[in-house]
């Protein structure tokens, strides 16, 4: 198969996944008990007022008509209007999405910076105390709920030690940097505002560590497994027989080849972090998409919930596409059916 045929297949898969997410999210959101019109009107509003709001929102129409209108608007780049705020969903996503991306990128960076070295050391010192510690850390990270871990680090670092802030993106007395990318760290650097940069960095540490902890163990285990396979190959034994230093063999021979099968896991971790940010943002009062969609669900804001699902699923599938193409570029044997 050629590169372009694989790209075409992946793009079709992307379209089908997003379409399936639209259908499933629409059905589930309309099966949730409750009436958005009643929530907007208030408990004391008359039935006539509630019915008028339902007509304005189009909720009085059959479900297939509502779905057709939603899909038609979606093809025109319109994710609808938030029932709760009255603003376009796309406009709200532009406000909240950068905060979630900044948190996810920083968490992924931490997971890679800590997880890859731990995976290497775990493979080199197989069945020793560090290897057992890394495996224990991986199991603990996977089995620990993010909200519980988040509450724990808040109690420790904010409540008892009082060395890090417990929530938000900035202290209340600081103004956000001029909006360029929506990433406070990057925008503060572009603005040359060191005070805002370091304050934003302090606020980012706890939620990023909480998100990174789960994936840190996964990354370490994946690197360990790939490294063990590479270290048992003939070319490694040949390099050792040639008298090359042990760590040179590990870092310059085994590690580059071990990273190739790990690309899929490392890339998809970013998509998982976008979903995982929902609970973490709620715990840390982080003003991103996670906290926004939780509020939208509580208000039965169907357009906002569906917009969140479409954007996050699209981002997840897009990351999957990029990972597949990157994997194909690094190892062309896959396109010819020769890769593993």
Language model: regions and residue ranges:
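Residue-level signal for discrete positions within transmembrane alpha-helices
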Residues: 96, 100, 136-143, 152, ...
């Amino acid at each position: 198969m050629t590169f372009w045929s694989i790209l075409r297949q992946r793009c079709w898969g992307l379209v089908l996944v997003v379409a399936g997410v639209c259908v499933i999210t629409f059905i589930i959101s309309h099966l949730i008990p409750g009436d958005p019109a009643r929530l907007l009107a208030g408990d004391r509003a008359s039935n006539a007022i509630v019915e008028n709001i339902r007509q304005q929102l189009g909720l009085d129409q059959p479900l297939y008509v509502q779905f057709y209108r939603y899909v038609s608007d979606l093809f025109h780049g319109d994710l609808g209007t938030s029932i709760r705020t009255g603003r376009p969903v796309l406009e709200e996503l532009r406000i909240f999405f950068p905060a979630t991306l900044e948190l996810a990128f920083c968490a992924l960076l931490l997971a890679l910076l800590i997880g890859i070295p731990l995976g290497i050391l775990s493979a080199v010192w197989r069945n020793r105390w560090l290897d057992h510690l890394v495996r224990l850390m991986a199991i603990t990270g996977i089995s620990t709920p993010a909200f519980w871990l988040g509450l724990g680090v808040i109690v420790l670092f904010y409540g008892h030690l009082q060395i890090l802030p417990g929530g938000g993106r900035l202290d209340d007395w600081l103004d956000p940097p001029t909006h360029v990318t929506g990433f406070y760290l990057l925008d503060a650097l572009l603005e040359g505002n060191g005070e805002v940069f370091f304050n934003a960095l302090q606020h980012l540490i706890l939620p990023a560590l909480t998100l990174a902890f789960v994936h840190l163990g996964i990354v370490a285990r994946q690197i360990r497994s790939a490294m063990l396979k590479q270290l048992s190959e003939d070319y490694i034994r040949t390099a050792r027989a040639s008298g090359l230093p042990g760590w040179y063999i590990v870092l310059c021979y085994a590690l580059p080849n071990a990273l190739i099968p790990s690309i899929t896991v490392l890339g998809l971790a970013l998509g998982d972090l976008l979903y995982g940010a929902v609970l973490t943002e709620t715990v840390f009062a982080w003003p991103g998409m996670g906290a926004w969609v939780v509020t939208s669900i509580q208000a039965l804001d169907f357009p906002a919930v569906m917009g969140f699902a479409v954007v996050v699923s699209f981002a997840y599938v897009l990351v999957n596409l990029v990972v597949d193409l990157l994997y194909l570029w690094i190892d062309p044997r896959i396109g010819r059916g020769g890769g593993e």
